[in-house]
Every structure is written in C-alpha cells, then in structure tokens.
Design a protein with these regions (language model features):
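N-proximal low-complexity "stem/linker" segments adjacent to membrane-targeting elements
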Residues: 1-15
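C-terminal catalytic/acceptor-binding lobe
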Residues: 171-228
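Short, well-formed alpha-helical segments that are part of the catalytic scaffolds
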Residues: 13-27
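Active-site-proximal specificity loops/subdomain of glycosyltransferases
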Residues: 37-89
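Conserved catalytic core of nucleotide-sugar-dependent glycosyltransferases
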Residues: 100-183
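Conserved glycosyltransferase catalytic-site signature
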Residues: 71-77, 153, 179-187
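Short loop->beta transition adjacent to catalytic acidic/histidine clusters or analogous donor-positioning motifs
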Residues: 2-4, 26-35
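Short beta-strand-to-loop acidic/aromatic patch adjacent to the donor-nucleotide binding site
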Residues: 89-100
C-alpha cells in the first residue's frame, strides 16, 4: 500500500470512464487509486460503496431543485467515505470521472499545504441561493455565522489530519449539515480546522461547473473539469 490515495468518483462505466481511470493511475504511480460510487449504480470493479446513513441528508434540497437527484447535491460524501473506509493514508485527493488530466497531481498542484480546493468562497455570500436554502431549511443553521465553499467536488486535496477532523465532525453532528449543498458543506467543515486554499492561483481557468467556463488546451499541462 502506498501512503497517498486518489478517490475516483463516478456513477456509470463506459470506455471513456475506464480510460480516464487507467490514465489517472498511470500518471500517478506513487498514489493508490480506488473508485467509489453511490449504491445502486454500475460501478468499476473494486469500487467502494458509499453508506449514506451515517452522513447528513440533502433530500430537502430536492423539493426546491427537483430536476436533480439527491446524489447530485452530495459528492462531498465521497471524500469522507474514502477516508472512513481507508483511514491509513497520509494524503487524499478527490477526482471526479468528468475530469481529465495529462500530468501528475504533484506536477500541477502545490501539495505542500494541508488542504486545497478550487472555486473558493471565503466566505460565501448570504444572498447565494444555496446559502439561503440552508439558512431557511436547517434549524441548526445559526451554528455557523459564515458559510464557506471549497468549490467543485473534484481535484480536492486533504492531508489526513484535516480530513480526519472533517469526517469526525460531519458524522458526530450530521444534522447540523442537512440540506447543505456539497460545496458549502465541505467548505464550512474545512473552515473549522484550517484555511481554505487553492492548489494553484489560476485553477479557475481549469476547473469550473460548466464547459463554457473553460478553454480546453490539451497541449499544455492540465487538469480540466467538466469534460464529458
């Protein structure tokens, strides 16, 4: 076993997903790479299956944004479950199936930190719809004077000591984090134990929510998201 783990999140299998999984392993020989997914989906062999029962529930968000399945609101759970099932690594990196790369993690990102995300909101605006939904539909919302976001749930890096504290907190006090979109739930968790950081200053040129926000140049070193 290596001392670093890449958690490869996905919800279906086709030739492209298989190629991206294998490419990730090839580019990062010093990391173990393990796939993970929600129960009930066609997943890669050897995948960890996420047990959602011990975590917060975002079902309430579905009533207000019904075009999405509840799992769409909860990809941060993959990181927590990766640690929960595989707690003996020193470093963890969450990588979503619709991300592409052509270099190793260390070649592209600064891993000399205890955490990094992408589109950091430090803190998020109270007028943001996801913050407003949380404030309205979770009676424990006043526990958090400010709400933070770590960005998209891909290319997220944790040192063990930070992820361990996040997992312990989100399980112990899971009802505090119900109806909280993954980006703001994870960001608010992380903010309790360290500062929110980026893996590189120009990361928003590479990682976004929609393809229209990024200019894909395959000839330069990259981690791009989303690329379907």
């Amino acid at each position: 076993m290596k001392n670093k783990l890449i958690i490869f999140s996905h919800h279906y299998v086709d030739d492209i997903v298989i190629e991206r999984f294998n490419n990730l392993k090839k580019l990062n020989p010093t990391w173990d790479v393990i796939p993970i997914g929600f129960d009930g989906y066609n997943l890669l062999d050897g995948s960890l299956i996420l047990d959602k029962s011990k975590y917060p529930n975002n079902q309430g968000l579905v009533y207000f944004v019904p075009k999405y399945h509840v799992n769409w609101f909860e990809p941060d759970l993959f990181t927590y479950e990766g640690y929960y099932q595989k707690p003996d690594y020193d470093e963890y990196f969450l990588y979503e199936y619709d991300t592409i790369c052509n270099v190793s993690i260390e070649e592209f990102f600064n891993t000399n930190v205890d955490f990094f995300g992408s589109t950091i909101c430090n803190p998020g605006a109270e007028t943001w719809d996801w913050v407003k939904l949380y404030r309205k539909h979770n009676p424990y919302n006043t526990r958090f004077k400010k709400i933070y976001s770590y960005g998209q749930s891909t290319c997220i890096y944790f040192k063990k000591e930070i992820l361990k504290q996040c997992v312990e907190e989100v399980i112990k006090n899971k009802y505090f984090y119900d109806n909280m979109l993954s980006e703001i739930r994870a960001g608010t968790l992380v903010s309790q134990f360290t500062s929110l950081k980026k893996g590189r200053e120009d990361i928003n040129n590479f990682i976004s929510w929609t393809p229209d926000d990024i200019n894909v140049n395959l000839n330069q070193p990259h981690f791009y998201h989303p690329v379907k």
